[in-house]
């Protein structure tokens, strides 16, 4: 292995000089032995100098320090040894539970599966969340994005999906925390223990592996931690298992790239993003796919800066997804949670040939009623409800009930709401909304539909409200 020395340090980017006949390849891992720091080569600048990103803090690193070339990209533990463990970007355990004792390691950089290896599935993944199952159903082996600005509930929605799917799911899960709050990662770990998905006494009985590169970490960690998690998920998939991959948050992956892009000497692109934004996103997303041996179903939270869905980062992510769940600040302001916008959210699965005519007609019926209500809002604001035709008054009444029926108490939010979470089957979801569209429940007050599970609960709630009023 060749060795070199540090010649320049600019924050997270470090230049290292090697003998000209043994220059490291791009993506090779370098180690600063004295500091226990790993670097990843990004560019070859010529004259034996390479530019690398530090996978850790560069404090205390000085010019002239010796650097060793490992001759290979960053390798992380893969396989069942990772289950129940929390690891960092390099695959080192950070849960204070001893070494990982892996039998196999894999490079975090690899090519996406070839076209003839890919497999598509039309099987639906039931989430138990009414609004998702109705208007933007998830495909098993598909890619899902949860889009939303700050504080509208991306992480809570993701935690509920993990609670509903991962705990019921017979396969394995990988959770990659990319640049999010350490507190949330900590809460998630203990929730998984309570649910029995993580067994700290017998790791081999655990069903989830966790990889964290949190907000306080240098950009190198946040840039590569998603690839570390994906590498672990790929190994399970290639062994023929069905894997769930949760990534919170894809935007922080992009942001980490933006932070180091200028330091790497690249010219900024639109809104200051790196010029390689689409390529970096493609490299990650093309690997998150299902093959003929196994499937990866990924659920990714995507932060939307300033609630602008046309921002280059979320806009680039849209192209890769099968289902997009858009969280709306306006809906959250009404107190309707989950604050999912049924008009903005979409899914490739919303096709009568896949989900059936009944489900399709119900979903489109709900969307058309809500769209009509949206159009009438301006008239109502100026002239009031009295100026509407009888037909429009009925539409508004049904739309308001539908809006409230799209809300649902979550298990993970029980500490805030004091209500037990509800999981609603797809059959109950469809029949409930069909009844609302057909006018079956026109006589019930709209408040009866707020924060309930199935339609039977709404009817029961209406009865109690009537008794109270009497």
Curated annotation (Swiss-Prot):
GO terms for molecular function: ATP binding; ATP hydrolysis activity; proton-transporting ATP synthase activity, rotational mechanism. Keywords: ATP synthesis, ATP-binding, Cell inner membrane, Cell membrane, CF(1), Hydrogen ion transport, Ion transport, Membrane, Nucleotide-binding, Translocase, Transport. Its EC number is 7.1.2.2. It is found in: Cell inner membrane. Signal peptide: none annotated. F-type ATPases have 2 components, CF(1) - the catalytic core - and CF(0) - the membrane proton channel. CF(1) has five subunits: alpha(3), beta(3), gamma(1), delta(1), epsilon(1). CF(0) has three main subunits: a(1), b(2) and c(9-12). The alpha and beta chains form an alternating ring which encloses part of the gamma chain. CF(1) is attached to CF(0) by a central stalk formed by the gamma and epsilon chains, while a peripheral stalk is formed by the delta and b chains. Belongs to the ATPase alpha/beta chains family. This is ATP synthase subunit beta. It comes from Saccharophagus degradans (strain 2-40 / ATCC 43961 / DSM 17024). The gene is atpD.
């Amino acid at each position: 292995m060749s060795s070199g020395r540090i010649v320049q340090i600019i924050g997270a980017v470090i230049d290292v000089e090697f003998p000209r006949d043994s220059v490291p390849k791009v993506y090779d891992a370098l180690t600063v032995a004295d500091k226990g720091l790993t670097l990843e080569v990004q560019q070859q600048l010529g004259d034996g100098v390479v530019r690398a990103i530090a996978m850790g803090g560069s404090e205390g690193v000085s010019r002239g320090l010796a650097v060793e070339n490992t001759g290979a990209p960053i390798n992380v533990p893969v396989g069942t040894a990772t289950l129940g463990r929390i690891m960092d970007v390099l695959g080192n355990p950070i849960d204070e539970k001893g070494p990982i004792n892996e039998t196999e390691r894999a490079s975090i950089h690899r090519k996406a599966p070839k076209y003839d290896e890919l497999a598509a599935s039309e099987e639906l993944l039931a989430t138990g969340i009414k609004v998702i199952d109705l208007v933007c159903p998830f495909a098993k082996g598909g890619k899902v994005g949860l889009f939303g600005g700050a504080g509208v509930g991306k992480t809570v929605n993701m935690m509920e999906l993990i609670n509903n799917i991962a705990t019921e799911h017979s396969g394995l899960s990988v959770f990659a925390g990319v640049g999010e709050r350490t507190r949330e990662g900590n809460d998630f770990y203990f929730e998984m223990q309570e649910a029995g998905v993580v067994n700290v006494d017998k790791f081999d009985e655990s069903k989830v592996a966790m990889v964290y590169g949190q907000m306080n970490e240098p950009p190198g960690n946040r840039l590569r931690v998603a690839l570390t998690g994906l590498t672990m998920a790929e190994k399970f998939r290639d062994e023929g298992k069905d894997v769930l991959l949760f990534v919170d948050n894809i935007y922080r992956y992009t942001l980490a790239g933006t932070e180091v892009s200028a330091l790497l000497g690249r010219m900024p692109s639109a809104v200051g993003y790196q010029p390689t934004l689409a390529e970096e996103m493609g490299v990650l997303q093309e690997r998150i796919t299902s093959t003929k041996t196994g499937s990866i179903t990924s659920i990714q939270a995507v932060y939307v800066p300033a609630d602008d869905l046309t921002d280059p980062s979320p806009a680039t992510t849209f192209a890769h997804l099968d289902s997009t769940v858009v969280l709306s600040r306006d809906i959250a302001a009404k107190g309707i949670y989950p604050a999912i916008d049924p008009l903005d959210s979409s899914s490739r699965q919303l096709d009568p040939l896949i989900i059936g005519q009944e489900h399709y007609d119900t979903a489109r019926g709900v969307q058309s009623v809500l769209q009509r209500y949206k159009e009438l809002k301006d008239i109502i604001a100026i002239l009031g409800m009295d100026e509407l035709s009888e037909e429009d008054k009925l539409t508004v009444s049904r739309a308001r009930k539908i809006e409230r029926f799209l809300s649902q108490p979550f298990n993970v939010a029980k500490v805030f709401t004091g209500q037990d979470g509800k999981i609603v089957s797809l059959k109950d979801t469809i029949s409930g909304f069909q009844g609302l569209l057909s006018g079956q429940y026109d006589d019930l007050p709209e408040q009866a539909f707020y924060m309930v599970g199935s339609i039977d609960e709404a009817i029961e709630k209406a009865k109690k409200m009537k008794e109270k009023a009497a």
